[in-house]
Amino acid sequence: MNFVLKTILEEVRIRVFWILICFSFTWFTCYWFSEEFIFLLAKPFLTLPYLDSSFICTQLTEALSTYVTTSLISCFYFLFPFLSYQIWCFLMPSCYEEQRKKYNKLFYLSGFCFFLFFFVTFVWIVPNVWHFLYKLSTTSTNLLIIKLQPKIFDYIMLTVRILFISSICSQVPVLVICLLESKGVKTFIKNRRFFYSFFAFHSSFFYTPDIWCQIIACLPIYFIIELTIFYALIIQVYKKQLAL
């Protein structure tokens, strides 16, 4: 028992060590090219017509915070495949051959959905969101003149939040498959309040204190959870009818 525990702890230590090394190099690389990453995130907004391609900083440390935050978020996105691979290497030796095949399919599906949703969100959804917000920030009459001067940090954070919500949405197919295969739909329904509490806690920390912003941030996640449960129940009932 002690030998098995020591082996597991040694394996965890090795995996964590390589993750920390990779995280350090990735973060420094992302920070070195942070200006290029900021330009990529700002490109959907800069391509809007009749817009001055400039941002403003209202605080002395805002530029530094933007560079550090952008590099850190980019680091996590680049580190995600390596982190998933390390988790896969740690868990696979304890699985049977049939379980490995099933988990490999879920692993590939998760990665494919993640990058597909990320690409679609960045190319199509983010530009349309900023086009809509830009239209609301301009006036068509001379009675009231509103000129949009976006803050770079607020823009980056809002774009990242949209990408984060998209990343969570991308795992819905994987979650549905896991619920159907493990027959844990009832357990998920009973414990879904914990998911609601987690996302409410997340929105209170990472979003503005405005109640409407937090509601808008939580509603898509709540809708996805309910849609996942509804779809899993439909598939479960359909399989029971086929078995009769």
From Swiss-Prot:
Q: Please report the record's description of how this protein sits within the membrane.
A: Multi-pass membrane protein
Pfam families of this UniProt entry? TatC
InterPro entries tied to this protein = TatC (IPR002033)
Q: Domain of life here?
A: Eukaryota
Keywords attached to this entry: Membrane, Mitochondrion, Transmembrane, Transmembrane helix
Family assignment from sequence similarity: Belongs to the TatC family.
Q: What is this protein called?
A: Uncharacterized tatC-like protein ymf16
Q: Provide the taxonomic classification.
A: Eukaryota, Viridiplantae, Streptophyta, Embryophyta, Marchantiophyta
